[in-house]
Amino acid sequence: MANGLTIAICSAILALIFSGLWIRRIYAQSAGDSRMQEIAAAVQEGASAYLKRQYLTIGMVGTVLFVIIGLALSWNTAIGFALGAILSGLAGFMGMNVSVQSNVRTAEAARSGLNEALAIAFRGGAVTGMLVVGLGLLGVAGYTALLVSGADETSSISDLIHPLIGFAFGGSLISIFARLGGGIFTKGADVGADLVGKVEAGIPEDDPRNPAVIADNVGDNVGDCAGMAADLFETYAVTIIATMLLGALLFKTGTGDAAVYPLALGAASIVASIIGCYFVKMREGGKIMNALYRGLAVAGGIAFFAYLPITVWFMGGATLTLDGTEVGGGELIMRLFASTTIGLVLTGLMVVITEYYTSTEYPPVQHIANASTTGHATNIIAGLGVGMRATAAPVLAVCASIIVAYSLAGLYGIAIAATAMLSMTGIIVALDAYGPITDNAGGIAEMAGMPESVRAVTDPLDAVGNTTKAVTKGYAIGSAGLAALVLFADYTHGLEHANKLMTFDLSNHLVIIGLFIGGMVPFLFGAMSMEAVGRAAGSVVLEVRRQFKEIPGIMDGSRKPDYSRAVDMLTKAAIREMIVPSLLPVLIPVLVGVFLGPQALGGVLMGSIVTGLFIAISMTAGGGAWDNAKKYIEDGNYGGKGSDAHKAAVTGDTVGDPYKDTAGPAINPLIKIINIVALLIIPLL
């Protein structure tokens, strides 16, 4: 066990060192002229102010929960909760700061060409990715080492590492607040800016005359960068912890090694992801997306070859009971190695499937663009249809992965497949954080009045960034589905371990009631999220209209808008609106568990997983398709910018924005928090 912890801690430190080195390389690049630096400073000031206020609010909620967990469960669990929350927040805050510094340098590098701008944008994203996996693995492995150090021989591994559930809960709490609050901010700004700027005033995106333009750029950083970092930090840590707990419960021999085996897989993938980052380079005449995917493919290939010796090392002496038969030695090694391969294959499938439904190169997006030629309503109908259809292939891929992984190594096989999938988080976050960096770089170029040659570089980078953001959301949702299933397995085994053995029979009315309540939660949460964005966007619309009316000279460029007003309004709105929906997944399992019992609570867990998976995929894929349908028309198809088709596509994109960037992604942490809270309260049931 000690070897696994040492390897994980060393690999996590390597990821942090790599982040530090690339931060230095990014900061060494030119930040452009004074106008560019002024815009970047305004974006950074707004993003920092928002995150500080968000973390202050979370801190107040977290302090109350820390005391409750400490008194009701254990102080080790409470300490884990605090550690998970702090590290998750730190990953998001540091990633956001690097993103803001990378934006302006990417815009300046675009003067020199596509390859130079791509290099800085991807490095900025890679820093965030390595911070997420480095801090996540360091936190889990480091806290595990503290928990097992000095323990007496009579203590079981599962009891010793049980406080890690607190770590998972801390990361999850930050995740849902960051995803939801950041999403409300960014889409409130985006929708408000588009409705008045593009639709009413007829000015282009990122035009400095729009009073909401700085708020829009701030939102990209707090939502797409800090929000996604917190989301995948949580998914990464939760999956590793859930697999560790399951291994400690299922294995009778080699329990310690089974508990740290997921940490070793994560450690190997960090090294693989670092190497993969160096393969992201444009070839002469090549595509930007191919350069990014090359890095992902190299990382996946190296991880594949590393997993076999790691499995031999850690699981060679373990035995697992499958269908009443003891399996160990070479057979178990190959079964577990095959399970890791399932996770890597599912990663590739989720990337390919999501790109198909959200890229301008494929029929779904082109279908929405074509539907825009006949009006706003047909655009909305087509987008909703694509979003619904986009659920089929990912869900079938997840189902196939579950079937194969279960046939190989039972529930532990599913957990290992999920761990292998999530072990690629470092380079996946790099692809995602690349998106807001290129988006902001284009905005800075527009606001600073840089030459058209710069926009000719930033625009294709931004178009690819839209697809990478959609792809990583698909990956996050698919992995969240697997992670939630592993957490449900932990819940059932946790009940068994606590001598509360139960069956979840569909003929039991309590289980059915739980399924209905669990199925309701993602819909209720999604509705609250969408309505929150609508209210925030409405306030921005009124403010932008007011400034256009009351500040003469904005439209001719002789006077500047009051950018800070929209930023401050959205900050207050996002903080206010995020609290009640974010507490929903904490309160519902507690209330159901206390008043209806553990069987109904089990139904809640399964119901939330099923409906949450479908809603999240539908929203993120549909929203991404709406966005890129607009971009497809702006590229000169179906009449291009300013045409009736373009106006209809802008409406679709405006509806799709909160779909794909607020409600959809926030459902990921929602379904996992419900499961984690259920795990936490087992002793109280």
UniProtKB/Swiss-Prot annotation:
E.C. number, please?
A: 7.1.3.1
Judged by the first EC level, this protein's enzyme class is translocase
UniProt keyword annotations, A-Z: Calcium, Cell inner membrane, Cell membrane, Hydrogen ion transport, Ion transport, Magnesium, Membrane, Metal-binding, Translocase, Transmembrane, Transmembrane helix, Transport
- Positions contributing to Mg(2+) 2 binding: N217, D220, D439
A GO molecular-function descriptor: magnesium ion binding
- Name the record gives this protein: K(+)-insensitive pyrophosphate-energized proton pump
Family membership = Belongs to the H(+)-translocating pyrophosphatase (TC 3.A.10) family. K(+)-insensitive subfamily.
Could you give one GO CC term from the UniProt record? plasma membrane
What function does the entry list? Proton pump that utilizes the energy of pyrophosphate hydrolysis as the driving force for proton movement across the membrane. Generates a proton motive force.
A Pfam family matched in the record: H_PPase
| Quaternary assembly | Homodimer.
Residues noted as binding Mg(2+) 1 in the record, renumbered to the chain: D190, D194
Q: Identify the stretch annotated as signal peptide in this record.
A: none
For this UniProt entry, which segments traverse the membrane?
Answer: 3-23, 55-75, 78-98, 127-147, 157-177, 231-251, 260-280, 295-315, 333-353, 380-400, 402-422, 475-495, 510-530, 578-598, 600-620
Q: Give the location in the cell.
A: Cell inner membrane
**Matching InterPro entries, A to Z?**
PPase-energised_H-pump
- Where are the residues marked Important for ion transport as a site? R179, D224, D231, D661, K672
Organism expressing this protein natively: Nitrosomonas europaea (strain ATCC 19718 / CIP 103999 / KCTC 2705 / NBRC 14298)
Q: Does the keyword NADP apply?
A: no
Question: Coiled-coil regions in this chain?
Answer: none
